[in-house]
């Protein structure tokens, strides 16, 4: 009898621990403004996120390397790679360490922090995300002009937002649309 009770208590504790981990450990979420869930996986500090697109003015490829921050509350822009100078692309020494790599200009050591990211698909921009090695070709999934939001959030908070339409956590603090 005592062995059964011990086994049941152990299983209950194990189930509780698994549920607690699921509800508390943050997710990296990618959603469209239409409400489509495009990606949701457990986030971890240092999780790589790459944004690839064709610059709308220069018509050349741009790649931005980010990571999930140590607090699991947002993103850190580490580096940008591009082929030609253009509007919105970094070039000042104060923005990081600038170098050339073949046909590319590379700005590293940027360390810019963002609580969340809002991107838009565009005509010919081929917006693509690489999330922890998984490629998401958003330009093939969404109409041009669609907003795409990336954020890190605890599953219970994300569930509350979906159920009640109220924002919680970093997204609310940052004024997410």
Give the ranges of each region predicted by the language model.
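N-terminal secretory signal peptides
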Residues: 31-82
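Covalent nucleotidyltransferase core used to form phosphodiester bonds in nucleic acids
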Residues: 85
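A residue-level signal for beta-strand positions that form part of recognition/binding surfaces
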Residues: 27, 48, 74, 104, ...
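Aromatic-capped interface at the extracytoplasmic side
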Residues: 18-34
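Hydrophobic membrane-insertion alpha-helices, especially the h-region
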Residues: 7-23
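Positively charged n-region of N-terminal signal peptides that target proteins for export
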Residues: 1-5
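Mature, soluble, non-transmembrane domains
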Residues: 77, 88-177
């Amino acid at each position: 009898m005592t062995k059964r009770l011990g086994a049941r208590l152990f299983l209950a504790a194990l189930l509780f621990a698994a549920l607690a981990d699921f509800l508390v450990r943050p997710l990296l979420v990618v959603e469209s403004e239409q409400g489509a869930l495009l990606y949701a996986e457990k986030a971890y500090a240092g999780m790589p996120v790459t944004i690839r697109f064709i610059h709308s003015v220069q018509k050349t490829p741009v790649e931005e390397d980010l990571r999930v921050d140590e607090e699991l509350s947002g993103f850190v822009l580490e580096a940008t790679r591009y082929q030609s100078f253009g509007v919105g692309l970094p070039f000042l020494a104060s923005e990081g360490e600038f170098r050339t790599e073949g046909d590319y200009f590379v700005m590293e050591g940027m360390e810019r922090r963002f609580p969340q990211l809002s991107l838009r698909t565009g005509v010919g921009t081929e917006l693509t995300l690489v999330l922890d090695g998984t490629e998401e070709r958003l330009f093939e999934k969404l109409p041009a002009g669609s907003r795409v939001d990336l954020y890190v959030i605890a599953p219970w908070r994300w569930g509350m937002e979906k159920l009640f339409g109220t924002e919680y956590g970093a997204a609310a603090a940052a004024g997410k649309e």
